Amino acid sequence: IQTPYFIPDEAILNALMIAVKSGIEVNIMIPCMPDHPFVYRATEYYARELINKGVELYRYDNGFLHAKTMVIDGQISSVGSANLDFRSFKLNFEGNAFCYDRDLAKHLTDIFDEDTKKCTKLTEEYFLNQSAWRRFKQYFSRLLSPIL
């Protein structure tokens, strides 16, 4: 999954947790540069929560990541305008194309793998080394996430 805004609702969080518990590898890439501070801090909150559950998270360090892609089981791909956030799910008129094509899925996976070379893999240690002020901003932004 590549997304600039990662503020999942309960259904997406549950789906990701079920996938991880089923032994499916879940990789998510988010940007390093915030264009909306509250959205980015909420994204960091959810990133930390998922790292603790077994999701692999990458922070793209080569500019602002604006890709909105997903590959499922090496067979299904999603590309479009929808972010993984409340606004895209409930408010905005976003659209994604779902393609059932192994070649496209492989191509998007190759792009993701190439992009990981420009990433920092996020770990629990990364979050533990953050200041209390930054963690406060993450928790506060999480409270605002339904309206972000």
Language model segments and positions:
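PLD/PLD-like phosphodiesterase catalytic module centered on the HKD motif
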Residues: P4-L148
